[in-house]
Swiss-Prot record:
It comes from Allorhizobium ampelinum (strain ATCC BAA-846 / DSM 112012 / S4) (Agrobacterium vitis (strain S4)). NCBIfam families: PRK00228.1-4. This is UPF0301 protein Avi_1069. Belongs to the UPF0301 (AlgH) family. One of its GO terms (cellular component) is cytosol. It comes from the Bacteria. InterPro entries: AlgH-like (IPR003774).
Length: 201
């Protein structure tokens, strides 16, 4: 599913607003021990973002690349911008940036993902974050995860993923190392138990 076709269809039992948690036997190395926040899931496919994968890029690098600041400005960036989290959102369009954020910031280009979370992919929100006018909670992701029609359903049927309702706190927590274990805990599963079950599958 392309980002431009992002829509929601919760009434038909799709998984938008849920986490996908990779099983230990996940065949695609892009998703090993990943937690994916599903933003849209319809008969046309699905798209979402990995929320526990680091990206060796700083927010200042993004601003410089977009010509929003110069080197002198980069040195003077306030702490909130200097420390703003950048993550790897997935293997599709890795050069493109997306901001998941709380709904206290909305622009004409913002797309509601849930009652409390929106998605914006324009320069306006990048400028707002750098100026201290951005949302209270946000993270920038480079790239996204996408599935074609029926692809995600097939992966779930083949035991590639577990799923559960998403946690806003987990999405925006800047500590990434334990997100996989914490996502499993949402459904009462320990990593050790999951690994043992997978080994006997």
């Amino acid at each position: 599913m392309a980002f431009s076709t992002l829509k929601s269809d919760r009434e038909r039992g799709f998984l938008d607003g849920h986490f996908l948690i990779a099983m230990p036997g996940m065949a695609d190395g892009n998703f090993t021990r990943s937690v994916v926040y599903v933003c849209a899931h319809t008969t046309a496919g699905a798209m979402g973002f990995i929320i526990n994968r680091t990206q060796p890029v700083k927010f200042a690098d993004i601003l410089l690349h977009l010509d929003l600041i110069d080197q002198n400005d980069a040195i003077m960036l306030p702490d909130h911008a200097r420390n703003f989290p950048i993550q790897c959102g997935g293997p599709v369009e890795t050069g493109r940036g997306f901001v998941l954020h709380s709904d206290d910031y909305l622009s004409d280009s913002s797309i509601p993902v849930s009652d409390d979370i929106s998605l914006t992919a324009t320069l306006d929100i990048v400028r707002a974050i750098s100026d201290g006018r951005g949302p209270a909670r946000a993270t920038m992701l480079l790239g996204y995860a996408g599935w074609g029609p029926g692809q995600l359903e097939a992966e779930i049927a083949n035991n590639g993923w577990l799923n559960c309702p998403a946690s806003e706190d987990l999405i925006f927590d800047p500590v990434l190392d334990n997100k996989y274990d914490r996502a499993l805990a949402l459904i009462g599963i320990s990593p050790a138990t999951l690994s043992a079950e997978a080994g006997h599958a």
